[in-house]
Structures are given as C-alpha cells and as structure tokens.
Amino acid sequence: MSVDGAALMVGIRTIAKWHPMDVNLVIEGETEANINVSNMTVYKNPFVAGDMYYNKCVNRCDGKLSVGLVEGISKMKLLKLIPALYNGTALDKEGTRYFECEWLELQTDHEVVIEMDGEIVGRPPARYTILKHALKTVIG
C-alpha cells in the first residue's frame, strides 16, 4: 500500500472514532478559553503525510510556529477536508483557521495523546516553542 493510501485509511479510521474536545489555548500569553477543536497541527513544514500539505507557507528561519486549527465540526465535514489536504486548500475551508506564534500552550482535561511526526510523546498540557537558529548545519 502507498503512503498516501495508508495515511488516508488511518485518517478515515481516526475520524470515525474521534470526538471534538474543548481546549484552552494560550498563545503568547493571551488565553482563548473553551475552544471546541477537532484537530490542531503545529508545524514548520507544510507537508502532512505523503502528498498531503497545507497551503500556508512557512518561513523556517523566522522563529515562529505555524498552527492549523480545525474547529469542532461534524465527521462528514472532517471527511470532506481530506481532498483539500491533497490540493493544499484545507486551511481555506470553513471551520479552519491558521495563525503563527512564537509559543503556544494547549490545555485540556480530555484524555488524549500528543503525537509528533508519527510518535506519541505525551499528554496535555503541551507547550510548543521554537529556538531560533538553534541548529547549525555544516556541509562539505
């Protein structure tokens, strides 16, 4: 099975089981309380999996995180977002939003896991930050 086929199957299976949850987001010190969320992606690379990607460009050197948020929408609307991930227009759809920030904290009482690049790394609360110019690359 291709990477795209596997990602699509996992996405559909996850949507079938998932229920939106209420979260508090602290974005650079400002709190947005009781937001009903289906999905939140914090990224520095617009590619999700296989050929899926977000259409919001990111500057990898600006010290800011890109955040794509899908509000608590119906399972049918979530399923309809899948094709938009393949043509890069998911964050233009109703019920989604995009923002950039230097740091972000996710707070919730729901029992969920935090997944990063396919690995389960913990449970909320979660704080996301980025260190500007922290990685030095030597070529040659």
Regions found by a protein language model. Give the residues of each.
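Long C-terminal subdomains/extensions of small-metabolite kinases
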Residues: 1-140
